[in-house]
A protein has these predicted regions:
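Glycine-rich, small/acidic residue-mixed loop/short-helix segments
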Residues: 206-213, 228-320
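A common structural junction motif
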Residues: 49-50, 101-109, 172-181, 259-264, ...
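Short amphipathic beta-strand starts and helix->beta connectors
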Residues: 12-18, 61-73, 104-107, 141-149, ...
Length: 320
């Protein structure tokens, strides 16, 4: 383990960003899918090719309705040939266990809420780099009893998710406030879908296909035809963009362009206050035509906070 110390309940009081450390992630939960058919069952439910997951790789995945709208998104990792863990918003665990269980039928797979069986910690900066220098996003390693998934960086800061059975000695590092993790997650440009944005987007509206969250080579899953058609026919009209605002913005707020203030052109998918106290950063799923024009953007109405576009930290895949 790296040579830092984590002291529970003693977060720093600094308002400025600290680029290395650890924090518990109590807002995240874990769904366990267990059984001989766990992988094949999920293969028919998620946008990800679960069969390709291995001991060295995790992946972003989404569960969609029949119209291709994302109900929840996950970080999927295979713990064994018969056990897959899905990391998601804690508020999504119960409804997703219930929803997915409806389709198990005769498959040898059982879904359960395993949140209390694990501890999840976010690692930032050198606390993440020390475990595997140069790790690429979605790569995975085992660290004793723990599983570590390396995520997309945020604001140039490396990130990783450490997951281990409850009671496992945690990684060590300066403890950071959870708000810093939320901000880094926003700056990564990847918005996770939970109850607040349930069925608000198809995967491409969040750039999931550009960050490895959609497989176009696997078999069917709910909404697959819509997702594939959007990609192959070039009908992607909305993308996720990073923006900055000087005033608070919130998930679920509509976004408007002052050239057409009566018609929303986007929706806030994720938002967090900047650690330096200078406003908010957010991920907005927005019409590509409006983003290309660089219009005068506002959140929550024409009189709402002004939004300034920021560069995405990853390239977008062109329409196939």
């Amino acid at each position: 383990m790296s040579a830092y110390s984590l002291s529970a309940g003693q977060g720093p009081a600094q308002a400025h960003p600290i680029e290395s450390g650890c924090m518990d992630l109590p807002h995240m939960g874990v769904i366990r899918v267990l059984g001989a058919d766990a992988v094949s069952f999920l293969q028919g439910q998620l946008t990800q090719d679960v069969a390709l997951l291995g001991q060295d790789r995790a992946a972003l995945a989404a569960y969609c309705n029949a119209k291709g709208r994302v109900q929840a998104s996950f970080i999927a990792l295979k713990r064994s040939a018969e056990e897959v863990l899905l990391i998601c918003s804690r508020d999504s665990v119960a409804p997703m266990v219930k929803r997915l269980s409806m389709f198990v039928l005769r498959a040898k797979a059982k879904l359960s809420d395993a949140t209390e069986e694990f501890r999840m910690i976010g690692l930032c900066g050198s606390a993440a780099d020390a475990l595997k220098p140069g790790a690429t996003p979605w790569s995975r390693m085992d660290d004793g009893a723990a599983m570590v998934v390396f995520l997309y960086p945020g604001a140039g800061v490396s990130r990783a998710c450490w997951l281990a059975p409850a009671g496992t000695p945690p990684p060590t590092g300066p403890e950071l406030p959870l708000a810093y993790w939320h901000w880094l997650s926003v700056r990564s440009g990847i918005a996770m879908v939970g109850p607040a944005t349930f069925e608000a987007f198809v995967p491409q509206m969040l750039n999931y296909e550009s960050v490895g969250g959609v497989s176009f080579k696997k078999g069917c899953y709910p909404g697959q035809e819509v997702v594939a058609r959007s990609q192959f026919r070039g009908t992607i009209k909305r993308r996720a963009y990073l923006v900055h605002a000087q005033a608070p913005v919130a998930v679920g707020q509509e976004v408007f362009d002052l050239s057409d203030p009566e018609q929303a052109c986007g929706l806030v998918a994720a938002a967090a206050p900047c650690p330096d106290g200078q406003g908010y950063d957010a991920i907005v799923s927005m019409q590509t035509s409006v983003a290309a024009q660089g219009g005068q953007l506002r959140a929550a109405g024409a009189q709402g906070p002004s939004l300034t576009l920021l560069p995405l930290p990853y390239p977008l895949l062109e329409d196939i």
